[in-house]
């Protein structure tokens, strides 16, 4: 037994040493796999640490909005983990395909499949463990940067940066790695059991085959591809951000991209062949045929990669803009620290909200420095459509898509109540005579229609028997309630006497705390929770801000998260394809070397091939992104040009770092494979 134990220990030491040596020897193969796993783990940590990052914002989570956002991000991470899992498995499959001959040699030397599987497990533990550790460290660093960017862009009051580490995110990364580890080992065992010794030994002799088509057909496909690309751009902007047209646009774009890659290589080969001086210069003939052959054989993959790059750059560029757009509109969504609302038709009460609270024993005077109660009335015969004149810009679009119920009656508010709200918000009251009215609207598209009416409408309107004309510059966008969506499509501000006799169906009590602090918010809400069956509804400023901020920030994170993952997927596939191509071309480069080709010329040839293979999908993807970014930011609306520029710059930096890293790693990797690192 002692001898057997000693033999097993020696075997373990031998396998450990062999695994380390194999990792070192195959580092040029493992490098892309290592970088892909490292980036994957770092992204998982960065975006799963969102719960810890929320703690920097110093926002109350009474409504559990931050917890919901963390859960939403965790759900998205499950989907992302599946994508990354398949990507890592794809990289591992490529690695095993390139090592089949080596594994076949192990079998000829008498090593059992069980021992080979054991060896592969140890290799995976070494390379996976290193990428896991470095990935988590990189994720911790990136999460701090993401926190700083979030605080800067959202400009949340009280937000303060501090260094945080999320133990939960670390655990999630470990779970992801463990699942990938077991799945890869299962795949490796299945691969070894499936292939015979002959298949393993001669696996490196198999190459991809490219379709052969006539030149006229290629010119036709290229023309069709250009038409599809142009049509896609036109379709995407036909009707603003209409998902039906956007979906059609993406499908047409993919078809155009596929036709482009299916045809362009053969056409360029034909055209360059006519340029004899260029074609026969140095190793250009070899380079041109290599690039043409590779693009022809991988046109479907390149089409998908091109769209991934387009989606990646667009989502990263627009992602942070979502939060900025929403944060810019926060001031329009809240009018006071707390707004208590009553629907008279529901509660059946005739007393005011303030009197109702006093009856219930709510300490309103103690908790607030000022209160303003306003009644909203309804004029049944005046609706939004009453102000839509012929020629109103965007009228058809508004009626068709977004605001189909244009016959909805408008709210009516007394000018005295409106001025009380303005004073509470630190604004000057408005002087208006008895024959005028104002319109308050916070929906920008509808507000533009009212402004057009102010310029071109002359006929007065009839309100409760009073003939009123719109006051000059009488369109306002002042909030008078706390809401999570801008929904005031028009409130008529009329002289007090014009509202006399109208039935009040809704009352709002705008409250300002005695001090603007988290403690006062907690005290107010604790007192509110003690009330039972009030028939009233409450919306606090901090609760609304927390809800909107957490939702918009989560959407921004998801957009950037997906964008970076798409980028990693595209880069990894490109890198693996080129590495596989280099291994397949080892004999061809040896032939060039025997024919007297210079090492510098062969390096230039290799660099050109990789540059074209990486560059063409990137250029196309960025061109597509120009249209995509324009459409998205047009829909988002109030995002300043300098913020858009910053977001695009951020996306560009991400592309330079990730895309550039994969490019240089691929070039150095293939250069070592082809032994072109010698002078």
Place the predicted regions along the sequence by residue.
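Transmembrane helix boundary and interhelical loop/hinge segments in multi-pass membrane proteins
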Residues: 88-104, 194, 283-284, 577-591
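Peri-transmembrane interface segments
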Residues: 24, 28-35, 46-80, 94-97, ...
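Selective transmembrane-helix segments that form parts of the transport pathway or gating/packing helices
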Residues: 27, 33, 120-138, 174, ...
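Basic-flanked hydrophobic alpha-helices used for secretion and membrane insertion
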Residues: 64, 329-568
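Membrane-embedded alpha-helical segments of integral membrane proteins
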Residues: 230, 234, 241-278
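N-terminal Sec/SRP start-transfer signal
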Residues: 1-41, 208-224, 228, 262-309, ...
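Small-residue-rich transmembrane alpha-helices
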Residues: 42-53, 90-94, 127-156, 169-194, ...
């Amino acid at each position: 037994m002692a001898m057997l134990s000693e033999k097993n220990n020696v075997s373990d030491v031998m396998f450990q040493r062999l695994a380390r040596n194999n990792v070192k020897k195959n580092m040029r193969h493992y490098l892309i796999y290592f970088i892909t796993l490292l980036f994957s783990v770092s992204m998982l940590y960065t975006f799963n640490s969102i719960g810890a990052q929320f703690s920097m914002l110093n926002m109350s989570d009474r409504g559990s909005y931050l917890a919901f956002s963390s859960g939403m991000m965790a759900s998205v991470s499950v989907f992302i983990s599946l994508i990354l899992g398949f990507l890592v498995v794809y990289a591992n499959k490529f690695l095993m395909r390139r090592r089949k001959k080596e594994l076949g040699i192990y079998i000829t030397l008498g090593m059992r499949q069980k021992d080979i599987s054991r060896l592969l497990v140890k290799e995976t533990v070494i390379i996976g463990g290193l990428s896991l550790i470095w990935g988590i460290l990189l994720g911790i660093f990136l999460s701090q940067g993401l926190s700083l960017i979030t605080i800067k862009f959202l400009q949340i009051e009280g937000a303060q940066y501090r260094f945080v580490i999320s133990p939960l995110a670390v655990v999630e990364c470990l779970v992801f790695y463990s699942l990938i580890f077991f799945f890869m080992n299962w795949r490796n065992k299945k691969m070894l059991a499936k292939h015979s010794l002959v298949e393993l030994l001669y696996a490196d002799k198999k190459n991809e085959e490219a379709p052969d088509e006539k030149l006229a057909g290629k010119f036709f496909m290229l023309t069709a591809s250009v038409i599809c690309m142009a049509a896609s751009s036109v379709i995407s902007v036909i009707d603003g951000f209409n998902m039906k047209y956007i979906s059609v646009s993406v499908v047409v774009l993919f078809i155009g991209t596929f036709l482009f890659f299916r045809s362009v290589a053969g056409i360029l080969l034909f055209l360059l062949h006519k340029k004899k001086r260029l074609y026969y210069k140095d190793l250009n003939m070899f380079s041109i045929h290599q690039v043409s052959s590779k693009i022809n054989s991988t046109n479907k993959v390149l089409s998908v990669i091109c769209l991934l790059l387009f989606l990646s750059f667009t989502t990263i560029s627009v992602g942070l803009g979502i939060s900025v757009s929403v944060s810019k509109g926060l001031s329009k969504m809240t009018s006071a620290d707390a707004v208590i609302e009553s629907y008279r038709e529901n509660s059946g009460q005739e007393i005011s909200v303030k009197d109702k609270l006093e009856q219930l024993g709510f300490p309103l005077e103690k908790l607030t420095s000022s209160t303003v109660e306003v009644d909203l009335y309804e004029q049944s015969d005046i609706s939004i459509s009453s102000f839509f004149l012929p020629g109103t810009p965007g009228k058809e679009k508004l009626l068709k898509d977004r605001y189909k119920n244009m016959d909805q009656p408008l709210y009516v508010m007394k000018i005295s109540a409106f001025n009380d709200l303005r004073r509470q918000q630190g604004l000057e009251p408005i002087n208006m005579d008895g024959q005028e009215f104002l319109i308050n609207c916070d929906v920008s598209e509808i507000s533009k229609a009212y402004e057009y009416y102010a310029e071109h409408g002359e006929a007065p309107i009839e309100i409760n028997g009073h003939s009123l004309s719109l006051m000059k510059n009488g369109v306002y966008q002042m909030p008078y309630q706390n809401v999570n969506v801008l929904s005031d499509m028009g409130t008529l501000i009329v002289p007090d006497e014009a509202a006399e006799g109208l039935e009040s169906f809704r009352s709002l009590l705008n409250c300002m705390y005695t001090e603007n602090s988290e403690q006062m918010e907690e005290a107010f809400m604790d007192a509110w929770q003690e009330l039972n069956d009030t028939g009233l509804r409450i919306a606090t400023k901090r609760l609304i801000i927390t809800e909107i901020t957490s939702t918009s920030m989560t959407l921004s994170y998801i957009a950037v998260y997906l964008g970076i993952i798409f980028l990693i997927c595209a880069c990894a596939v490109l890198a693996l394809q080129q590495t596989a191509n280099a291994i397949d071309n080892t004999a061809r480069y040896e032939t060039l070397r025997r024919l007297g080709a210079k090492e510098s010329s062969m390096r230039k040839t290799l660099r050109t091939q990789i540059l074209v293979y990486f560059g063409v999908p990137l250029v196309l993807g960025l061109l597509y992104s120009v249209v995509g970014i324009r459409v998205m930011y047009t829909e988002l609306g109030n995002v300043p040009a300098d913020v858009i520029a910053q977001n695009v710059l951020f996306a560009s930096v991400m592309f330079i770092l990730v895309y550039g890293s994969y490019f240089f790693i691929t070039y150095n990797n293939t250069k070592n494979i082809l032994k072109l690192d010698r002078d």
